[in-house]
């Protein structure tokens, strides 16, 4: 098992929402139904619409593992009716509501379907920037791995490919593709 790239789990709101930062605890409270109004997190006096992804999605699994941990989520007010590969529909459904919050992986939200009408929130005062993810300052992140069968020979094509992914050129391709370099 070899780490090859990183990605951040991000929260986003409409660009006109005044909120810039939330703590992990505030996000857990929003998604567990304990915080229901933006005024409770120093925002405007308006109800929060907390979108959730489908229960069988990779993104929802990330939400449960990285963010909610052992805390229960409330049933969704609104669900992002999308598979992981169709997040553009999610964002287009979401954009025009200033009181909404949603989540995704940075790669999906920022690279595949970049949308100028959303902004990413800082979590615990740390923005989900490339450098903050690479340096481990932004904590909500995942690592992608290459899994190779044990006993693969050093001069095999598999080993050569893995070495190419790990070298400077390979990691630059990782970055150009929209992920965060691991090395």
Regions found by a protein language model. Give the residues of each.
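Exported/periplasmic ABC-transporter solute-binding proteins
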Residues: 1-183
């Amino acid at each position: 098992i070899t780490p090859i790239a990183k990605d951040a789990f991000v929260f986003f709101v409409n660009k006109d929402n005044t909120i810039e930062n939330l703590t992990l605890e505030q996000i857990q409270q929003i998604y567990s139904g304990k915080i229901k109004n933006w005024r409770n997190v120093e925002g405007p006096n308006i109800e929060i619409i907390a979108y959730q992804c489908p229960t069988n999605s990779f993104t929802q699994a990330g939400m449960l593992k990285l963010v909610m941990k052992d805390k229960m989520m409330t049933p969704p007010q609104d669900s992002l009716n999308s598979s992981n590969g169709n997040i553009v529909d999610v964002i287009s459904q979401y954009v025009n509501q200033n009181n909404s919050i949603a989540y995704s992986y940075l790669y999906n939200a920022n690279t595949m379907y970049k949308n100028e009408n959303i902004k990413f929130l800082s979590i615990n005062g740390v923005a989900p920037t490339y450098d903050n993810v690479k340096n481990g300052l932004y904590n909500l992140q995942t690592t992608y791995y290459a899994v190779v069968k044990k006993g693969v020979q050093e001069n095999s094509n598999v080993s050569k490919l893995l070495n190419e992914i790990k070298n400077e050129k390979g990691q630059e391709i990782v970055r150009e593709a929209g992920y965060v370099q691991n090395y």
